[in-house]
Regions:
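Generic ordered-secondary-structure signal
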Residues: 1, 11-12, 21, 29, ...
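Active-site-adjacent pocket scaffolds in enzyme catalytic domains
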Residues: 1-7, 13, 62-122
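Metal-dependent polysaccharide deacetylase catalytic core of the NodB/CE4 family, i.e.
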Residues: 1-58, 81-91
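Repeat-unit-sized solenoid/scaffold elements
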Residues: 37-51, 78-80, 155-173
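A structural signal for short secondary-structure junctions
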Residues: 42, 64, 79, 125-127, ...
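Intrinsically disordered, low-complexity segments enriched in small/polar residues
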Residues: 48, 66-69, 180
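Generic alpha-helical secondary structure signal
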Residues: 54-56, 64, 186
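Terminal accessory/targeting
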Residues: 93-192
Length: 192
């Protein structure tokens, strides 16, 4: 009876890193998992959660070509301007599974982000990468003041406002090899 309350979506066959893989490997990981979901669970919803939240241009465009909605591993709310090939998802496991944080998560509003640059966050060479965030509207001076970012394991990054609609976020220290995260927040007066 609980099965009616649960959907299981595609997360690949082997949950391996999908960066720099051949088309053959990528298609096998995505399509074989989808066929198994359809065969064993009679579910054929085309949602794909990138393993480890990682993808490159090739993986992104294959997800697009085959009509999937993609999920990264970054936290955030989904809005009308969200990239439906790289949607955010909130973690609800282990230390992130507290009910108080769940209430906060389901009441979170999307930030008015139009896009981010670079689109594909595979970094090589520049160990203090700059992230440009372009907003879908002008932010008030108070919103810009309250806009805050964090970098995994570091002090707060440098924020350089280009204008009221664009900001550059840059780590103060080199990022370690492996996965790192830039996380930005901004309070809202709206109710979530």
């Amino acid at each position: 009876e609980m099965a009616e309350l649960v959907d299981v979506y595609n997360h690949s066959v082997t949950h391996q890193h999908l960066i720099d893989k051949t088309d053959e490997v990528l298609l096998n990981e995505i399509i074989s998992a989808q066929l198994r979901l359809k065969s064993e669970l009679s579910q054929d919803n085309k949602f794909f959660a990138y393993p480890y939240g990682e993808f490159d241009g090739k993986t992104y465009h294959l997800i697009e070509k085959y009509g999937y909605i993609g999920f990264g591993q970054h936290s955030g709310a989904i809005g009308s301007m969200s990239d439906f090939l790289n949607l955010p998802r909130f973690a609800m496991a282990s230390s992130y599974a507290e009910m108080d944080s769940f209430v906060t998560k389901i009441n979170t509003l999307p930030m008015p982000v139009k896009n981010e640059e670079p689109k594909f966050m595979i970094i090589s060479g520049n160990n203090k990468p700059a992230l440009r965030i372009n907003f879908s509207r002008s932010l008030t001076s108070n919103e810009r003041y309250q806009f805050t970012c964090f970098v995994s394991g570091q002090e707060m990054p440098d924020l350089t406002w280009l204008n009221s609609e664009s900001v550059i976020v840059q780590a103060k220290e080199s990022l370690p090899q492996g996965r790192s995260r830039y996380n930005c927040t901004m309070p809202s007066k709206e109710k979530g």
